[in-house]
Amino acid sequence: MAFFKIEYNSKVLGMERQVNVIYPDASELTAAEVDDNDIPVLYLLHGMGGNENSWQKRTNIERLLRHTNLIVVMPSTDLGWYTNTASGLPYYDAIAIELPRVLKRFFPNMTNKREKTFIAGLSMGGYGAYKIALSTDKFSHAASFSGALAMGMDG
């Protein structure tokens, strides 16, 4: 597998952003996945206080992915809650809309198919994963690990 640290200019946020990507070993990929631009992708969103490095520093993600055919994308969003707000930056647009387009330029073999596109997150990232998955048609599966899913609800 290969590990990429990418810094790109986010037009949506008006600043440089960072994203880490784990790309599967070519020997693990099928010819159809490569030829059809159909490598599955998982977006992993960090929690509050985290960044694009959190999943690698705090989990065994690389060991778990050693023999898979999955691209894993780990962006940084500061404390943006993966949300567009009136007084803050449009982090929802940056992650849900802009980032997949940016990554497709770097990784043209990454799938565009909903059934092979997944999203998950921890805490704040769990909230973001559900918010993005439920408000777009891009993701077939979503997971929230200790996500703050009841924000704004009474009791």
Stretch-by-stretch model annotation:
Residues 1-155:
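Non-catalytic cap/lid and distal C-terminal segments of serine-dependent acyl enzymes
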